[in-house]
Amino acid sequence: MQNTLITIALRGITVLPRMRIYLDMNRPMSIAAATNAQKTNQNVFLVAQKDPSVENPGQEQLEQFGVIAQVKQIIKGPEDSFRVLVTGLQSAKLESIEEYVPNLIARVTVFESEKNDEQEIHL
């Protein structure tokens, strides 16, 4: 199933499904994406950058796979930094970047979960 989602490029971190984590953000594009998603109650697509030094990554600078996540909380930090609490929901594949301004918008293919939430893996 394909979706179009607000996208946040992550530097130096990967978020996985079911993971809850605070992300430190200071890029205006990332802050705008998180704020827009929270205001409109939309999920976001989180995808790692191949090279963290690239300030405004295009599709070729992004990894092929990421995670759909929910923005739970945004906390204003010192200066222009923000801490954003996200929860990873499902894995997804980046198909294309549709827009770049004011934030990235990506078309992604969602991987349906094969595992029932009540199942556990025992080793």
Question: How does the language model describe each region?
Answer:
Residues 1-123:
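N-terminal low-complexity, acidic/polar interaction/targeting segments
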